[in-house]
């Protein structure tokens, strides 16, 4: 009996020191802000990782699956960068913008576009710039068709690559994250994994494509060049910010997968479910500020988990 009691006591002590990230979050309040040390947030989905130490500095709703909207384009970018790295593709390779693809993804759909023209031949380099800088749905589709002959075949490749890098909760249905009846779903934890792997596996590609301030491509009806600013809400506003992608649907709200580096220390973050573009930007900046101020070591960087919000309307806009 004494031995059994001692064993139970030892298990209890060990359990007390398990990372909080391993514990299930059973709190269900949808209204109270989450506090961890000096940080508090109303965001239903938040995750912040110190990339170098691996410490999860803050986590809330990180395993909840949701539609990522244009953040799915980071997966498309990873696939393309992987093909470039393996020599199966070059930046100079040109793909033609087919009539079917153009009709499906030009600006009349209401989605983001880099303003490709029908039958235009565009380099992989320019398509990647359009994909990331201005969130071009057309760029994603042209890459998919050019690489695999069709969007469906490319999506199979996306899902295979996602599984191979440890994205265990994610499934993609389109190359650009356009609403597809609930097929495309990710988790914040998987998005953090994707960003981490992209930055580690393709540092040159990350540096080349993810922090371009603006992109000029296409001609407006009045003959002027079309110039669009980068959609990243903290690029140029937050010291060290250098990627990755925004997203927006009515289901997921305003979302952002972002990264910044200061003094050799890199943080990766996800926020989702924000009520406006401004709220998304402000939350991202505040979370990053808090993260860089926090001490991040493997010993002290266990996740702090908070309440999750389950109520969202299904939905439809895409940026």
Put a short name on every predicted segment.
Residues 6-16:
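Bacterial N-terminal signal peptides
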Residues 9, 80, 311-312:
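Enrichment for repetitive, rod-forming helical segments
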């Amino acid at each position: 009996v004494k031995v059994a009691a001692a064993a139970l006591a030892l298990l209890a002590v060990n359990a007390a020191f398990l990372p909080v990230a391993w514990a299930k979050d059973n709190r269900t309040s949808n209204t109270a802000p989450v506090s961890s040390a000096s940080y508090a947030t109303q965001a239903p989905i938040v995750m912040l990782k110190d990339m170098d130490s691996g410490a999860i500095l803050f986590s809330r709703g990180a395993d909840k699956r949701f539609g990522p909207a244009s953040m799915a384009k980071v997966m498309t970018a990873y696939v393309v960068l992987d093909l470039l790295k393996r020599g199966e593709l070059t930046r100079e390779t040109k793909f033609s913008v087919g009539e079917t693809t153009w009709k499906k993804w030009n600006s009349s759909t209401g989605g983001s576009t880099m303003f490709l023209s029908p039958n235009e031949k565009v380099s992989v380099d320019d398509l990647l710039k359009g994909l990331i800088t201005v969130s071009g749905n057309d760029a994603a589709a042209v890459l998919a068709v050019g690489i695999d002959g069709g969007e469906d075949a490319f999506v199979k490749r996306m899902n295979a690559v996602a599984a191979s890098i440890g994205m265990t909760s994610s499934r993609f249905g389109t190359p650009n994250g356009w609403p597809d009846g609930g097929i495309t779903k990710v988790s914040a934890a998987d998005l953090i994994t994707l960003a981490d792997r992209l930055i580690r596996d393709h540092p040159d590609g990350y540096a080349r494509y993810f922090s371009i301030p603006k992109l000029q491509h296409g001609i407006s009806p009045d003959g002027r060049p079309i110039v669009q600013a980068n959609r990243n809400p903290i690029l140029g506003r937050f010291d060290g910010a250098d990627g990755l992608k925004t997203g927006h649907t009515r289901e997921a709200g305003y979302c952002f997968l972002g990264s910044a580096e200061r003094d050799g220390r890199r943080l990766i973050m996800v926020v989702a479910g924000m009520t406006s573009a401004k709220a998304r930007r402000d939350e991202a900046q505040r979370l990053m500020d808090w993260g860089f101020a926090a001490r991040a070591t493997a010993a002290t960087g266990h996740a702090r988990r908070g309440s999750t919000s389950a109520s969202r309307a299904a939905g439809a806009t895409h940026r």
